[in-house]
Regions:
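Outer-membrane beta-barrel porins/channels
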Residues: 2-329
Length: 329
């Protein structure tokens, strides 16, 4: 009997990337149209922010994008009690009819930073080269930084912008156990279980928005510039359980020059869960997971042939199905 202990560090994910997307021409809809649609049903008298009232603290509203867009001048309503909204980017034409401004283009810039790092403490035991057992305890550290800037340009210099900031930090733990059995000299059978990673996470988020608008008022051209922001100390603590995984494998040595291996993995995406910090279930999110995800199956088959003592050729195929459930027609 022999045994060993090991420690390892792995960077599982690097989030660093920057990208820009832009579009031009006559676009049909604006971000302001989308925000106006989202705000439908909310009394406009409750969306406005002043020194005596903070709509972000109003539990009955619950949609910060609508609040931010309203205070940034994206949309208007007919009166303070009205619950229907329209994009502010337009004006009455010569016939008195409402005419939207031409949306000439939009641009999105995104910057992402962060990583997922894992620290493993592993233990293994070998029993007479017939049975090999292993176990690993892992601690995972996650940090993610997201910044985005979105701009739209209308005719006559009218414009809007939306900036988003998100910081996510979390720590998780997991364990893996496995065994390899050699019932015969030419055959190896293996099984392993990778537990979920249980994360404790914190999201910190902040948004800024603004607009510049020109319009006619009693025959006189006027302009309006508005800027708004969400509270800068907003955060959300939660817990997340990632999918667990089973692995089954077999390998056969054929003579002295060939090897065939088969691996099967079962990834249980349907077991993902979100929780509040008090341990209660995030009912709506978890129901979405149950409704939309299932287990994913992966099969890998490979073969290796040793052409010379120093050179071998290996080939293989793999198949995975989708973890997304098919929508019923």
């Amino acid at each position: 009997v022999s045994w060993n202990v090991g420690f390892s560090y792995n960077r599982l994910k690097n989030y660093s990337r920057n990208y820009t997307m832009a579009t031009g021409g006559d676009l049909n809809t604006s971000l302001s149209d989308y925000v106006a649609m989202r705000a439908a049903g909310m009394p406009s008298g409750l969306l406005g922010e002043d020194k005596d009232y903070n709509p972000y603290n109003n539990q009955d509203l619950g949609d910060w994008l609508s609040i931010l867009g309203y205070n940034a001048g994206y949309m208007d309503s007919y009166n303070d009690n009205d619950k229907e909204y329209y994009s502010a980017f337009g004006d009455n034409n010569a016939d008195g009819q409402w005419s939207p401004y031409l949306l000439q283009g939009g641009q999105l810039k995104v910057s992402e930073r962060g990583s997922v790092d894992q620290y493993d403490l592993a233990f293994g035991i070998n029993i007479s080269e017939l049975v090999m057992l292993g176990a690993t305890v892992a601690i995972t550290d996650l940090n993610y930084r997201y910044q985005s800037s979105y701009d739209e340009e209308f005719t006559n210099g009218n414009n809007l912008y939306l900036d988003n900031y998100l910081d996510t930090d979390g720590t998780g733990y997991s364990f893996n156990v496995g065994a390899i059995v050699r019932p015969a000299d030419f055959l190896r059978l293996g099984v392993a279980y990778n537990s979920p990673t249980w994360y404790k996470m914190t999201d910190r988020y902040y948004g800024e928005a603004g607009s510049y608008l020109t319009f006619m008022d009693k025959g006189e051209m006027k302009e309006r510039k508005l800027d708004a922001a969400t509270p800068n100390n907003a955060y959300y603590d939660y817990e997340f359980r990632s999918p667990d995984k089973w692995i089954f494998s077999a390998a056969a040595i054929l003579g002295t020059t060939a090897l065939i291996s088969v691996d099967y993995e079962l990834m249980n995406y349907k077991n993902m869960r979100m929780y509040q910090t008090d341990g209660s279930s995030n009912v709506y999110t978890n129901q979405d997971i149950t409704d939309n995800f299932k287990s994913m199956n992966t099969i890998r088959v490979g073969a290796e042939v040793k052409v010379t003592p120093q050179f071998a050729v290996r080939a293989g195929v793999a198949y995975s199905d989708s973890p997304k459930k098919k929508k019923k027609k």
